[in-house]
A protein has these predicted regions:
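Conserved S-adenosyl-L-methionine
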Residues: 18-127, 132-134, 150, 154
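Long recognition/docking surfaces used for binding and targeting
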Residues: 1-10
Length: 168
């Protein structure tokens, strides 16, 4: 109950300029994508894990055997820059049955996008990139010149381009 009240508080109002996508929206988007067991999904600014949980709720309906359950547990990948939302995300995923969530406390924009390989790509990228922010000049160094920008949302779109599988 405490976790749910903290989550609702964060989702209903911006916290330090952050706004979280309402659960009804994350659920709707996951339903429209129609995830399948074996597909991988990423959210590179996952906040408290709303998109990750919505994806898992859709996948959970399809689990029919142990192999499906193992794929389910490895189907999501998240990164969150800020400590408090990251901790809430881990808690959220533990409460939804993931023993070892593949979610990391890191800054998505601080890795050179040209270093990503096919192994770093996902079938689906389901997220709400941070809008309205600007990044320091050194962050642009992680992107090719034609994609370098100080706009946070533009940089996340570039990351998405480099991390989505060819037919994703």
């Amino acid at each position: 109950e405490i976790y749910e009240s903290i989550l609702k508080e964060l989702q209903s109002a911006g916290s330090s300029g952050e706004f979280y996508t309402p659960r009804a929206v994350t659920d709707f988007m996951a339903q429209m994508i129609k995830p399948k067991i074996g597909e991988t999904m990423a959210d590179f600014a996952c906040g408290t894990g709303g998109f990750l949980v919505s994806w898992l709720k859709e996948l959970q309906k399809q689990i029919k055997c142990t192999a499906d359950a193992e794929k389910y547990g490895k189907s999501i990948y998240g990164i969150e820059k800020k400590q408090f939302p990251y901790m809430l995300c881990i808690t959220n995923l533990l409460l939804h049955g993931l023993d070892i969530p593949q979610v990391y406390h890191d800054n998505t924009l601080l890795k050179d996008v040209l270093d990503y390989t096919d192994d770093d790509r996902f079938d689906v990228i389901l997220m709400n990139p941070p809008y309205g922010g600007s990044e320091k000049a050194d962050v642009k160094n992680h992107f090719p010149n034609d994609l370098a920008s100080s706009e946070t949302a533009d940089l996340f779109m570039a990351v998405i381009m480099y991390r989505l599988k060819k037919n994703g």
